[in-house]
């Protein structure tokens, strides 16, 4: 399923991902983090077991920390940064949907596994 949209996916390694997982995928998943610069704002994407709201990576005012690990979707707007969690496609927790996040036209959308919008995170 994911290999079909491999050119549209940005993934970072989770705390349970291994090299054997990478062998069946046609897009990279083994990076510890990814840094994107979009519209003058930095998005720091990481799994969240190392860098998270309690242990921040180097961020500037207005930057976005995007992490998973808890498998619970979230958007927390702090004074200096925004923290977002897309939840989990495979193992959602706290009665949340199987879901993922997309960035489209400067907005983050949380979608369920069928592709339906469940929420908008940031404008």
Task: Map each language-model feature to its residues.
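Non-catalytic terminal accessory segments
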Residues: 6, 122-123
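Generic structural signal for conserved hydrophobic packing positions in ordered secondary structure
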Residues: 2, 36, 45-47, 87
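Core catalytic region of metal-dependent phosphoesterases/phosphodiesterases
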Residues: 1-38
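Conserved beta-sheet core of the metallophosphoesterase superfamily
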Residues: 42, 49-119
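Structural detector of well-ordered beta-strand residues that form the stable sheet scaffold
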Residues: 10-12, 30, 44, 66, ...
């Amino acid at each position: 399923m994911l290999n079909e949209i491999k050119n549209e996916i940005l993934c970072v390694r989770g705390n349970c991902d291994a090299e054997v997982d990478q062998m069946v995928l046609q897009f990279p998943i083994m990076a510890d983090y990814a840094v994107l610069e979009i519209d003058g704002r930095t998005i720091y994407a990481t799994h969240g077991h190392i860098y998270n709201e309690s242990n921040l990576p180097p961020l500037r005012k207005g930057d976005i920390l995007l992490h998973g690990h808890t498998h619970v979707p979230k958007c927390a707007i702090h004074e200096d940064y925004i923290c977002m969690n897309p939840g989990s496609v495979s193992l959602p927790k706290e009665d949340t949907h199987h879901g993922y996040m997309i960035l489209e036209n400067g907005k983050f959308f949380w979608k369920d596994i069928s592709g339906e919008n469940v929420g908008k995170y940031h404008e």
